[in-house]
Amino acid sequence: MDLTEFNEIRPYNDEELPQIFEELIADPAFQKAATGAIPNVPFELLAQKMRACKTKLDFQEAFCYGILWKIAADHTAGLTLDHTAIPDKSKAYTYISNHRDIILDSGFLSILLIDQGMDTVEIAIGDNLLIYPWIKKLVRVNKSFIVQRALTMRQM
């Protein structure tokens, strides 16, 4: 099997991140979204923080972890993770969730896994949700793989 056929939809590898970060940083639409989401921090500081991330986990810890815990504190009664059925924290596992909130649910699971010293999740996300090129890049930095919803039979 030629795995390169999945290059356009798989999560980025860590060695690809510097180039992707530079592409995101140079994108005016991403700049606008980032400064809108984090208005009290100059964009150049956000860019510097991105450039310091060497792995996808570094990125998740630097940008996603704190934001997700703030959302949880402000909008939930709390988060818990019973991982007693997981015998080996160093192995990969498959988690199955409903389609209630594909991004937030997996984000909450990831921060709980980080707190247990475990690896974060990869998620499938439909390309119908990726309305701008910078969003497609950002979700792949955040360990998502893209489900292409409008493929022809020949492309499948």
Where are the regions a protein language model picked out?
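Membrane-anchoring hydrophobic helices of lipid-metabolizing enzymes
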Residues: 1-93, 99-110, 136, 140-144
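Long, hydrophobic, well-ordered secondary-structure blocks that form the structural core
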Residues: 96-156
